[in-house]
Each structure stands twice: as C-alpha cells, then as structure tokens.
C-alpha cells in the first residue's frame, strides 16, 4: 500500500485550453477517494494521468515516495478496473485472473496462491473453471476486480466500473466494493458520474466541474456545506433548491424577482441590498400554518413511496419540498412552507461561491 500525491497537476492538449486546471491532492495510505462529476468534467482524464495513460502538462505525481510522472503504467504499481470488463472470452476465470501474472514471469505456485486468495475474497471459487459467457454481469466485474487484486498494487484505479450493471446489481456491487476495501485497505481512486456511488463509497469526494476540483471533502461536508452553486446543484437528489434574489436593506428578508419575500429569522444586515442565491435542501423545508409560512401553489406531487415531492414556484423559480409519505396534498392546493434559518445556504450569484454569515 502507498499514499498518492498530485502536485500542481494540469492538462492541456493544445497548450492553450486547460482540460485539467491546477489540482493538488494528497490521498492517504489506504484511503478511498471518489471523483464525481458530469461527462466532460475531466475526471477520467485525471485518472488516466495517474495511471500513466495520459501525460501531465505540468506538475508531478507521486505514489508512495516515488515520483511516477514519467514512468510507464506497468512501472507505477497500479491496477485498473474499467467500465468494460475486458475479459478474454476463450479463457476461464482462473486464466483471466492469472494472465497478467504469467506474462510478468511469476511462477505457477505463486500464481495459484494469488488467484486462490483473490477468488476467496471475491467468492469466485466455484466459478474458476467457467468462461466469461457463462457468468452474469456482476460476476464478470468481480473477475475484473480479481485480476487487479492478484497484482497486489500500491493503488487501485476504478474507471466507472459499475456503469454497465443494472440498478439492482449496482447496489449489490457497491456493498461488495465497500467490503473489499475494508479487507484490503488499498489506496483507491474511483471515478463515477453517479453521485450515489460517490456518497456511499467515498471516504472523501472530489467534485469535478470543467476541469476544476470544485470541492474536496467528506461526503457529509460536500452535502451539508457545498462550496459552490455547482456542488449544491450537483450533489443531492433532488438537488438543492436555489433561488436568486436580493437581501433587503435591513437584512431581514430575501426578495425574489416578483417581489415575494422570504423572511430571514436571523437578519443579515451586512448583505443589505446585495444580489445573492439562497439555497435550501427539499428535506429541510417544513409545512406550517398560513401565519408562519410562505404560500406555494402546488403544481404537481411526485409519489415516491417512502416520501413525496411537492413541486411549485416561488418568484417564477422552481421549488421542491420533500414531504412524508402520509402527506398527499392535491395539485392546485396551497402549501405554507417554513425555511428553518439553520438550513439556509447563501452563495454569491456572480462568482457562484459559498458565503458565510
């Protein structure tokens, strides 16, 4: 095992347009880090630079105490698991897992021991003689992981390994990945576009946007204290409600575009007259009496089973409130909503950055 360090790493293909803007990252020995973001945000490019499949434009990459920036992938002590399983169809499970060791000159007994141990960890012992066509998607992905495990790498790199699996199997494989990491305690860098994978697997999350690491933190930090409008809108399902408006001169109300005012129970006079974006998560909005709440005309109600989502508009801007499964107001009715002051987030509308009271 080893730590992973990225030092002022950047990437540009034409020398002008940055694909990855400067990123510094320290991954502790045994830590599981997940990079999450939309397509084209640079997360896979960054992973490929760590793997040695892409060259950095500037900066250095260290695995343990060794600078690996200019080393070939085979010399970096890494193992990758891809979205596609890349199994040899004519080989059985044992030979697929053993192949990388064979071409590196390992002895038969050493290969057998490593494959048997990986198969035990992944519960693949009964499948070692089967061909890939005889396996389910989840079993094939476990074989791909086994092929990485037998290398005993310093760092695991995962490139969207669950994307080809159906929803039920993804849940199962997420649990298996968590258990696998607890057993092996190998430093891991994992890429996904799925925020559920990021939040459930990661010890720390890197939220990527247009080549920038918008926020690096624990899943709880990223969810509870998003550093920017992008993070607030990307992490969470449904996303955080974001309302553009202006703080009143006395700092006691937040005024939306149509003149609707939202009370600020904790006045913010330092922001008086300033254009801001107010954020609140759907689950933090509460139903209350008409005297205490802000009215919202219910446009539609989504019934999700465990809870319900009430959709409406405030000042021409969408608002979603998460209700209990027992609350089933009728479309067209008026809800009165309360915004707890401790649940409010504020962002500078122009820069998109979080601001603190």
Curated annotation (Swiss-Prot):
GO terms for cellular component: ATP-binding cassette (ABC) transporter complex, substrate-binding subunit-containing. The lineage of its organism: Bacteria, Pseudomonadati, Pseudomonadota, Gammaproteobacteria, Enterobacterales. It is an enzyme of class 7 (translocase). InterPro entries: AAA+_ATPase, ABC_transporter-like_ATP-bd, ABC_transporter-like_CS, ABC_transpr_MalK-like, ABC_transpr_MalK/UgpC-like, Mo/tungstate-bd_C_term_dom, NA-bd_OB-fold, OB_MalK-like. ATP binds at residues 37-44. SUPFAM superfamilies: MOP-like, P-loop containing nucleoside triphosphate hydrolases. Part of the ABC transporter complex UgpBAEC involved in sn-glycerol-3-phosphate (G3P) import. Responsible for energy coupling to the transport system. It catalyses: sn-glycerol 3-phosphate(out) + ATP + H2O = sn-glycerol 3-phosphate(in) + ADP + phosphate + H(+). It is a peripheral membrane protein. One of its GO terms (molecular function) is ATP hydrolysis activity. This is sn-glycerol-3-phosphate import ATP-binding protein UgpC. Residues 4-235 form the ABC transporter domain. It comes from Yersinia pestis. It is found in: Cell inner membrane.
